[in-house]
Amino acid sequence: ATLPSTAMPVETTTQVPKGRDGFVQHLSGTAERVAQESGIPASFMLGQAGHETGWGKSEIKTANGGNSFNLFGIKAGKGWTGKVAEITTTEYINGTPRKVVAKFRAYDSYEDSFRDYAKLITDNPRYEKAQATAKTGSAVAYAAELQKAGYATDPEYAKKLSGAINSALRVQRAQA
């Protein structure tokens, strides 16, 4: 039986397993679908989602304790009209880690999160170089360009992200 086109695959709304291998396995189908449309390799998105959530251990929760489905730590800026989740997070201000309260985007599914991330990277001129490096397949170059463009405030972000991307890639290869 085929799903109606409006039905979401189950992995897009069920809680993601905690831990790298289960996390990657659970979200690979979603990442592959979005990669086909966006040109951003699935392993890059899985690695970034894994890094941002501690491989599913620390997902952003909504005020009522529900899942925000925000795998990428995307903030809800002035232009965001969707749902939000407000949490305390660590931001690096002048190189010093500080706890701040910030609003993050909230989604209806993990697929929505992947699609919004891909849209952010492909549509925002700030990430033009990152998008170009994604096509080369270099996790190190992609992570470096995201950091240069200001995706995160952590001064070690590129190093941590490229490690997470390569880790996701190893899991994907082992599961293939």
Descriptions of predicted regions:
Residues A1-A176:
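Catalytic cores of secreted/periplasmic lytic hydrolases that degrade extracellular macromolecules
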